[in-house]
Amino acid sequence: MPGQKIRIKLKAYDHELLDESAKKIVEVAKSTNSKVSGPIPLPTERTLYCVLRSPMKHKDSREHFEKRVHKRLIDIIDPSPKTIDALMRINLPAGVDVEIKL
């Protein structure tokens, strides 16, 4: 498929798990002789939650929780049918969200 590009976006809470998954995808794409751009680290989404510690009063006593979503972007340029087939067979961990655009 000349002139085409596959864009893969990965999201996870654990950055180590995310990097392992990105490495697997890049290795598979390179083994099928496709050009790979990435993994490109995208900005981390950081969400803070502020909660009262006590159920009734003591408004000054609060607890803060944080959620971080790490993201990576991988572009596969001029993929072959072999590449697409190999990408479909990859087993990725459960904590990694994969979004693919052609």
Curated annotation (Swiss-Prot):
<dbReference type="InterPro" id="IPR018268">
    <property type="entry name" value="Ribosomal_uS10_CS"/>
</dbReference>
<dbReference type="GO" id="GO:1990904">
    <property type="term" value="C:ribonucleoprotein complex"/>
</dbReference>
<protein>
    <recommendedName>
        <fullName>Small ribosomal subunit protein uS10</fullName>
    </recommendedName>
</protein>
<dbReference type="GO" id="GO:0006412">
    <property type="term" value="P:translation"/>
</dbReference>
<dbReference type="InterPro" id="IPR001848">
    <property type="entry name" value="Ribosomal_uS10"/>
</dbReference>
<keyword id="KW-0689">Ribosomal protein</keyword>
<comment type="similarity">
    <text>Belongs to the universal ribosomal protein uS10 family.</text>
</comment>
<dbReference type="InterPro" id="IPR036838">
    <property type="entry name" value="Ribosomal_uS10_dom_sf"/>
</dbReference>
<keyword id="KW-0687">Ribonucleoprotein</keyword>
<comment type="function">
    <text>Involved in the binding of tRNA to the ribosomes.</text>
</comment>
<dbReference type="GO" id="GO:0003735">
    <property type="term" value="F:structural constituent of ribosome"/>
</dbReference>
<comment type="subunit">
    <text>Part of the 30S ribosomal subunit.</text>
</comment>
<dbReference type="InterPro" id="IPR027486">
    <property type="entry name" value="Ribosomal_uS10_dom"/>
</dbReference>
<dbReference type="GO" id="GO:0000049">
    <property type="term" value="F:tRNA binding"/>
</dbReference>
<dbReference type="Pfam" id="PF00338">
    <property type="entry name" value="Ribosomal_S10"/>
</dbReference>
<dbReference type="GO" id="GO:0005840">
    <property type="term" value="C:ribosome"/>
</dbReference>
